[in-house]
Structure formats: C-alpha cells, structure tokens
Amino acid sequence: MKQAEILIKSTIDSSMQPSLFYKWETGEKRPLLVGLHSWSYDRFNQIKNMLPYAEKYGFNLLLPDFRGSNLETNPDCTKACGSLYAKQDIKDAIDYVVANENVDAENIFLLGFSGGGHMALMMAGFCPEYFKAIGADVPITDLEKWKEQNDNYSRHVLACCGNDSEEMLKRSPISYVDTIAKANLKIFHGKFDPVVPVSHSLELYDKLMKKYPASRIFLDIFDGGHEIDMESVMYWIISQYSGTEKTTVTG
C-alpha cells in the first residue's frame, strides 16, 4: 500500500488539515476504513492497529487528525474533542478521498477506540449516512460525567470545553440519540474498564433501545478493561461489508 500525507481545506475555517492515507494502487475502487485516533494522540496513533487489517482485507485506510489530541497542551484543543470543527474535518477528509482516490463510496467504515470511540459516536450523531458500519470501542459518551469520574482527564475536558457544562453536553454522544439511532453501529466495552466506566456505553444503549428498539445499534460487553480486541471489532466491520452469514440455531 502507498502512504501519503494529505492536506484538506476545512469547509468551516479554510485551514489546511492533515490526514494520513494508505491506498491500494490498483485501478478498482476499494472500501475505505476511517480510523480515529484516541484522546491523547494524533493521526499517527492507530497505524499499528489498523494498517495490518486494511492490508489483510484490501481496504484503503484514512487516518484524519481532526485538530489533534484532546489534551490541554494542544493549542487547538478547543477545536478538537468532538467540536463541529473536528467533526467537519473528518467529513471533509472522507469527501476528499472519495472525490480524488480509488474509494468505493458505498463501503465506508468508521472505527475508533477510547477517545476515538467517543469521536466515532459523535460522527454517528453527525452524518450516519456516510458509513456502512461504525465500530466504537470503550467510548466516552458523557463528558460531564467522565470529568467527575476520572481525575487524570478532567483538566483536559475542562480545557477543551472551556469549563462550560453546555459545551460538554454538545460534545457528548449522549446528546445525539435521535441521530445515532440512524447508524449501523456496534459498541464494544470492557466490563471492568478502569478508565471509562462501562456505564457510559450501557446508558447510551439503554436510551437508544428505549426510544428506538428496532434500530441497528448493538452492544458487546466483553470480559476485559480499557482495551481493544481488533479481531472482534474487525469481524463486525467485515460482516457488514461482505454479509457474513451466521449459523442458524434451532430449538
């Protein structure tokens, strides 16, 4: 696969925003895996996790920066962390590679872990129609709650959101249940997660099921902590791409 660093003009503020793009150099259009970096990192964060699977399954891979980390040390942190700027950067990057590269626009998949899981859910609440399937692993779903639950990250939440409860709510997936319900989405969360309590995923799922019981929202609570099981997550992605059939069980 060929790697390129691409710069895409933001349709909000016209700034040039970077993404990494790995593409197959064959002529036919390929499915696209969009990988989202975690809370404390940037576009380089998920190369090790996601590139081997893009190579294995023949996907192109897009790794957007979406204004960098959600840390107080990032001078752009108020435009990161689920802001409209960050969401639009991801959308702009997808639009760019669909228009200019060998990308199959009917088969775009989104994947994020931890802070990237938070952002995957924010995108499900922003433009669910862009994605054939979304995987969100150990996601934060309520920033205001998480600020109180994790002292190591509270100052970063405050820096990104300006210590504004309304802003935290705007940047929390729990606020976008009506739109998230339109997505084809699976949430993965470790039952014993010490970083982002499993209650984040449980509460979001509960809200979705009470209001939209027929939606294509799924939840996998696994035996583990704040971790990634790439095989399980990619099985979900591939099953939605290829229509993998499971064995029917009879009584």
Located regions from the model:
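Primarily recognizes the serine-hydrolase "nucleophile elbow" in alpha/beta-hydrolase
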Residues: 98-100, 106-149
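Glycine-rich "HGGG/HGxG" loop immediately N-terminal to the catalytic nucleophile
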Residues: 68-81
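Mobile cap/lid helix-loop segments that gate and shape the active-site cleft of serine hydrolases
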Residues: 45, 132, 139-176
